[in-house]
């Protein structure tokens, strides 16, 4: 399933950017309190609504980071399931929709190291921020991720 991810934060950044959905302006929300950087390009999927009331979050595996506000066509391959102080905050994992990535079709095709890196980042990136917390509950496969995506589309339309 092909999706479009609007990247807010490039891989390797400690800047937490947010795009204003009404104006399209990119704002610096904060500089991460922890000495950690985003493990992959990170953004959201338009016309979806996650359990936290924001568009569904997504990470993209690609060979080179892009700039904030760039839209990347990618394929859903899995989901990191988590909650934070605002409730459910799942992160879809996707891969660049490019034939050079045809060998990655499901979460089982992603290295354990990369999954561990992503999980560690999201479980700990808010550790030094008062009143914030994250609980990770593991990985889901492509089918589960696509179901979460479909539910987020329905939630947006409701």
Curated annotation (Swiss-Prot):
UniProt-annotated binding residues for Mg(2+) 3: 84, 89
Names of required cofactors: Mg(2+)
Keyword Metal-binding set for record: yes
UniProt-annotated catalytic positions: 89
Record's keyword terms, sorted: Cytoplasm, Hydrolase, Magnesium, Metal-binding
Annotated binding of Mg(2+) 1, by residue: 52, 57, 89
Annotated positions binding Mg(2+) 2: 8, 57
Keyword Hydrolase (UniProt): yes
CDD domains per UniProt: pyrophosphatase
GO cellular component terms attached to this protein's record: cytoplasm
Function: Catalyzes the hydrolysis of inorganic pyrophosphate (PPi) forming two phosphate ions.
Protein name, UniProt field: Inorganic pyrophosphatase
């Amino acid at each position: 399933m092909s999706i479009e991810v609007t990247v807010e934060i490039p891989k390797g950044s400690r800047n937490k950017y947010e795009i204003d959905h009404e104006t399209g302006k990119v704002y610096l929300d904060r500089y991460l309190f922890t000495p950690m950087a985003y493990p992959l390009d990170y953004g959201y999927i338009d016309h979806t609504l996650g359990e936290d009331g924001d568009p569904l979050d997504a990470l993209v595996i690609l060979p080179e980071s892009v700039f904030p506000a760039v839209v990347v066509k990618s394929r859903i391959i899995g989901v990191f399931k988590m909650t934070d102080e605002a409730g459910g905050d799942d992160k879809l994992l996707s891969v660049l929709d490019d034939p050079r990535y045809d060998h990655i079709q499901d979460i089982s095709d992603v290295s354990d190291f990369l999954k561990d890196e992503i999980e560690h980042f999201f479980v700990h990136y808010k550790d030094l921020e008062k009143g914030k917390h994250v609980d990770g509950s593991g990985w889901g496969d492509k089918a589960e991720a696509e179901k979460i995506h479909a539910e987020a589309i329905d939630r947006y339309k409701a």
